[in-house]
Amino acid sequence: MTAILERRESESLWGRFCNWITSTENRLYIGWFGVLMIPTLLTATSVFIIAFIAAPPVDIDGIREPVSGSLLYGNNIISGAIIPTSAAIGLHFYPIWEAASVDEWLYNGGPYELIVLHFLLGVACYMGREWELSFRLGMRPWIAVAYSAPVAAATAVFLIYPIGQGSFSDGMPLGISGTFNFMIVFQAEHNILMHPFHMLGVAGVFGGSLFSAMHGSLVTSSLIRETTENESANEGYRFGQEEETYNIVAAHGYFGRLIFQYASFNNSRSLHFFLTAWPVVGIWFTALGISTMAFNLNGFNFNQSVVDSQGRVINTWADIINRANLGMEVMHERNAHNFPLDLAAVEAPSTNG
């Protein structure tokens, strides 16, 4: 008997690298999207931490009145933020090498653009990596589709809104009080609370929280009893056991009697699709609403008050909202302009002399 030994050619370094990147045996899957995700998110995180601690004040309104946002310049965790790039920069791409010096780059809020653009690229790649790992494992792609909702929301406030408004200075600041300031100004300028897409987002988030709590508590309560009536049902289970502990028939029966029969799912896949779709679709709509309001297609307005036969205004809640919006609008960027756009649009009276 003759044995023929064939010498295998050793795999190239590039081939081994490709196999390692796409291997599902790694403790953490990297993937081709991960090759871009890792450096972009590390960059965004590193610059965020450094800037939050030590960045000098930024001339956000482009009027030579810098606003402090970092901890070393007098802020705390609540008031601190990465201040958006200056209105003097607008939508220009503003990397470090475009500035005359690092001091100028910091003064004009360069870190904000750097963080936001790297962050958006990173989370988009994270979404792609979710799809990629699902594909390698033969799974369906809906995990990445669900994650597209927060990605769309982040893209709306950090990129689409500044594009629509003409400047990165209108983007959401990266901090707690900065986020609230963004929300208040957004309401003042766009009446977002009266936009149907925002209403759908509120229903999606609050409804999703309710359904998640209902589902979790129902599953936790619907135990397959392994014990007698004289001892606790909890005694029949070990934490993390492999055996099934949840009886969907019992859960369906309970919930069907608590509300009514057809309010309860008897199919696990239908139930979990609903739990996924409700908040995801709601947040999609909110992101779409932000993206349309970016171009000043705003929420409903009731600028024409209700009047009686004598022409006197009959105050409604709409008038209260209008007055609140005007109050918020005159208070923001108060040194950049003297009047909000609503008031400044009125033709000035002529004067004699």
Curated annotation (Swiss-Prot):
Q: Pro-sequence positions in this chain?
A: 345-353
Q: What membrane topology is given?
A: Multi-pass membrane protein
Residues that coordinate or bind chlorophyll a ChlzD1: 118
Q: What does this protein do?
A: Photosystem II (PSII) is a light-driven water:plastoquinone oxidoreductase that uses light energy to abstract electrons from H(2)O, generating O(2) and a proton gradient subsequently used for ATP formation. It consists of a core antenna complex that captures photons, and an electron transfer chain that converts photonic excitation into a charge separation. The D1/D2 (PsbA/PsbD) reaction center heterodimer binds P680, the primary electron donor of PSII as well as several subsequent electron acceptors.
Residues binding chlorophyll a PD1, per UniProt: 198
Residues that the record marks as modified (N-acetylthreonine) are 2
Residues that the record marks as modified (Phosphothreonine) are 2
UniProt binding sites for pheophytin a: 126
Organism from which the protein derives: Barbarea verna
Please state what the protein is called.
Photosystem II protein D1
Enzyme Commission number, as recorded: 1.10.3.9
Q: Which GO terms describe its cellular component?
A: chloroplast thylakoid membrane; photosystem II
**Residues annotated for [CaMn4O5] cluster binding in this entry:** 170, 189, 332-333, 342, 344
Q: Which Pfam families match?
A: Photo_RC
Q: How does the cofactor attach, per the note?
A: The D1/D2 heterodimer binds P680, chlorophylls that are the primary electron donor of PSII, and subsequent electron acceptors. It shares a non-heme iron and each subunit binds pheophytin, quinone, additional chlorophylls, carotenoids and lipids. D1 provides most of the ligands for the Mn4-Ca-O5 cluster of the oxygen-evolving complex (OEC). There is also a Cl(-1) ion associated with D1 and D2, which is required for oxygen evolution. The PSII complex binds additional chlorophylls, carotenoids and specific lipids.
Q: What PROSITE patterns does the record point to? A: REACTION_CENTER
Similarity section: Belongs to the reaction center PufL/M/PsbA/D family.
Q: Whom does it interact with, and what assembly results?
A: PSII is composed of 1 copy each of membrane proteins PsbA, PsbB, PsbC, PsbD, PsbE, PsbF, PsbH, PsbI, PsbJ, PsbK, PsbL, PsbM, PsbT, PsbX, PsbY, PsbZ, Psb30/Ycf12, at least 3 peripheral proteins of the oxygen-evolving complex and a large number of cofactors. It forms dimeric complexes.
Q: Where is this site: Cleavage?
A: 344-345
Q: What class of enzyme is it?
A: oxidoreductase
What reaction(s) does this enzyme catalyze?
2 a plastoquinone + 4 hnu + 2 H2O = 2 a plastoquinol + O2
Q: Where located? A: Plastid, Chloroplast thylakoid membrane
Record key words, sorted = Acetylation, Calcium, Chlorophyll, Chloroplast, Chromophore, Electron transport, Herbicide resistance, Iron, Magnesium, Manganese, Membrane, Metal-binding, Oxidoreductase, Phosphoprotein, Photosynthesis, Photosystem II, Plastid, Thylakoid, Transmembrane, Transmembrane helix, Transport
Keyword Electron transport listed:
yes
The known PTMs are summarized as: Tyr-161 forms a radical intermediate that is referred to as redox-active TyrZ, YZ or Y-Z.
